[in-house]
Amino acid sequence: RLHRLFPDNESYVFEMEESLYNIAFANQNGDREIRYYAYLDGNKSRSDFLYHCCAGIGSRIFGSLPEYLFTMKDSTLSVDIFASGTLTWETPYGIVTVREETDFPYNGRISLRLESDAPHELTLRIRIPCYAAKEVPVLLNGKIVATGKPGSYATIARIFQSGDRLDFEIPMALTAHPYD
């Protein structure tokens, strides 16, 4: 993943997110699970065969989804793709649990709750997608602590306490893009 080599480049995560929503999820056949191909030219190739050589790869995507949500390095956590769930993260200072709550992409509201047995000095990087309609304020326990521009990461470096809550909302707008 190029994102691991260049973590400040949001465009790599955007490509992963776009592929997940527009290709991986779109490849599902309602009658027979994940069994047809969605080519990038917009056509879908259906077959009468139940299994193809790539069927295992399509299924593997869903098993690897947790790897796409967060990137961790030392005491820095990047929140890359938004989905409800729980991360148990072993930092240099101990275990931190991060609970993410969202209905993304149906709405842009996202909450992160941190839990630990002691305060931790951490850096949290929250992805602000390139398609966000405007800058995004990030609130810690109700107070703005960072603002992120579309196509970047909002960064919060501080000592976090157990029970801290981060809230932000990705403003979405309907846009049309030509397919090249």
Q: What is each residue range found by the language model?
A:
Residues 1-128, 133-135:
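Aromatic (Trp/Tyr) and acidic
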Residues 95, 143-144:
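Short, solvent-exposed loop/turn motifs
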Residues 110, 152-156:
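Short strand-edge motifs at loop-to-beta-strand transitions and within beta-strands
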Residues 134-142:
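Short, surface-exposed beta-strand/strand-loop-strand elements in extracellular ectodomains
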Residues 144-150:
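Short beta-strand segments within Ig-like beta-sandwich modules, predominantly Fibronectin type-III
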Residues 160-163:
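Short, well-ordered loop/turn sites that connect or cap secondary structure elements
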Residues 170-180:
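Glycine/proline-rich low-complexity spacer/linker segments in large multi-domain proteins
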